[in-house]
């Protein structure tokens, strides 16, 4: 008999407390606005990065981006058609921005995964997916050992897009259009610490222009790559 603790798909006091702490910190920040999305905790802040910082990050992405894969490691020509790369944690700008995300949310730096850059050309998209780990996935036992569930997601738009490219939360029936320098922060868990299916989201196809984002995911425990 295989003894696997299936703690990632149920309520968790640890993840609930993480949610409470981040929620309280963001709610106190006058620069941060909570987005009205019943059943989902999602926040936004405009001008989190300036134009120069966005341009520098776009250049880093352009230098290293490769065709995106799914978390399982497979490529899917229809499901995720963007280009992406992990940004070097030793780059001073990447380090500074990761630190600022942690300061904004109150989440421990050691729980944060490497900042990932993504680029979407016209017609490219990432269909509906969750950031939390399905406990039925083949990779879940490995994720348990490297920090556990993903609790919060922070994503920053790095470019204006002439048309399309919205972040779509289909179960909440709302979309957030790309605004250069804006950060979105959402809780992948419900208030009790169980995964929240309402956090499922998609990167809508870019209709005109090029969309750049960086994303940072936070684990419930120290992340071990």
Predicted regions and their residues:
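Fe(II)/2-oxoglutarate oxygenase catalytic core
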Residues: 1-185, 189-225
